[in-house]
Design a protein with these regions (language model features):
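Carbohydrate-interacting regions of secretory-pathway proteins
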Residues: 1-201
């Protein structure tokens, strides 16, 4: 729509529309810098996943099923902070826009209101990850460290609450330390444009 990728909201939750679902890049990325612009509808929720894996598990009937990308991928949160209830959940605003979802809050929180374009930046380099929002760095963290494991254990991705997600995220990117980038279909209207990826050697 007008040069952007638009997710048409189903209004019934995450990836529930018959023609919906997360949009995932065709190949994996290791060390990279991703920049784009996004805007969200009023009360909307989405996210940008990175270092995600294709993981299959068994359902209750013993059939193979593909796990949702959030089980294996850190998430740069996309949210209408003013209206969506998730903005007040979690800890210390760690579910607001540009936060590492449910793990680290974006500081400063400088998102523009629903319906306005925001700039997002994600840098991944040899285990160091940084999020930027509207030309400001808002958080940095380090994968595959004791601190990373402790963060997971104090979140909704803890070993007790979601053992598979904990295992996958604790070894984020798998053995090759690389994974898929994806845009989340959370059932709300969201737009992405000017998507650029720079490979970092």
């Amino acid at each position: 729509e007008d040069g952007s990728i638009k997710f048409n909201g189903s209004g019934i939750g995450e990836a529930q529309n018959s023609d919906g679902g997360d949009l995932i890049f065709a190949h994996k990325f290791k060390n990279f810098e991703l920049e784009l612009e996004w805007k969200i509808s009023k009360g909307g929720n989405s996210g940008i996943f990175y270092l995600g894996q294709e993981v299959t598990s068994k359902d209750k009937d013993g059939n193979d099923r593909l796990e949702m990308l959030f089980m294996s991928a850190p998430e740069y949160q996309i949210l209408d902070n003013a209206v969506h209830p998730d903005a007040q959940l979690g800890k210390s605003n760690n579910r607001q826009s540009a936060s590492l979802y449910d793990l680290i809050p974006a500081i400063p929180q400088n998102a523009k209101p629903a319906g306005e374009w925001n700039k997002a930046k994600i840098m991944v380099y040899k285990g160091t990850v940084a999020h930027g929002q509207n030309d400001e760095n808002v958080l940095e963290y380090h994968l595959w460290t004791r601190e990373w494991t402790d963060l997971l254990q104090s979140s909704k991705f803890s070993e007790q609450e979601r053992p598979l997600a904990f295992q996958l995220l604790n070894n984020c990117g798998g053995d090759n330390r690389e994974g898929f980038i994806g845009f989340q279909d959370h059932g709300d209207d969201v737009w992405y444009r000017n998507i650029r990826i720079k490979i970092l050697d």
